[in-house]
Amino acid sequence: MSYTLFISDLHLDESRPQHLAALEHLMKEHGGVADALYILGDLFETWIGDDNDSAFNLRAISAFKRFSSTGSKLFFMHGNRDFLLGGDFAQQAGGTLIAEGTVVNLYGIQALLMHGDSLCTEDEKYQQFRAMVRQPAWQQGMLTKSLAERRAIADGMRMQSQQNNENKAANIMDVTPEEVVRVMEEAGVNDLIHGHTHRPNVHSVQLADRMGTRWVLGDWGNSAWLIRASKDDIELTNFDIA
């Protein structure tokens, strides 16, 4: 049976090799069987540029290349941690970068794909940060710096983000319901798949003249979350990470 997989928020990092091992296992199991694998942002804890050819990054790229060489398609979307993923990375991995807000046909169902951070409109401080780092001029300026400088800046941003989040109300860091309705109506879809919030769940959404569904992927911690879509259904599931 044809099916497509979605994952997000793996936050791959050298300090957590078990997550990369779990991803390698997932891709080995489904490579050549699944129609496609979509990674909806925050694949890496940080990505400071495609020229950062560490052994860990090269291992991840090799795993993606093995998967894509089986004939299964591979798609990457930027998240709030890995917005510097570029064309060189995608080419080496054998995948394709897709934009936030891409609509795909899942066996007759039109689904809107997002990382999910743009849906958290009440977190105004974060949205200002997002607008800054998504500017091509800012990214180009970042990439002209040395790897050591970029790493230091990324570490500083991560620490600042953690400190900011400690003082935020939980609802501010979740999606804004009105924004969810707006983007789904604008895209003309009944289904939205996203990550970012680390709150895996399936939500019913009241649209103007119909009910929709919001599918939320979880982050990879002690378990790995994924969505499997086929012509029969869409399922949110998880498996333990050793």
Residues of each region from the PLM?
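Core catalytic region of metal-dependent phosphoesterases/phosphodiesterases
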Residues: 2-3, 12-106
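Divalent metal-coordination and catalytic microenvironments
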Residues: 9, 37, 42, 64, ...
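Short histidine/acidic/glycine/proline-rich micro-motifs that form metal-
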Residues: 10-13, 119
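A structural signal for the main folded, soluble domain(s) of proteins
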Residues: 24, 240-242
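Conserved beta-sheet core of the metallophosphoesterase superfamily
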Residues: 92-99, 112, 117, 123-128, ...
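A short acidic, often aromatic-flanked loop/helix-cap motif at beta-alpha or helix-coil junctions
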Residues: 103-106, 222, 242
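Active-site-proximal loop/helix segment associated with metal-binding centers of metalloenzymes
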Residues: 114-175
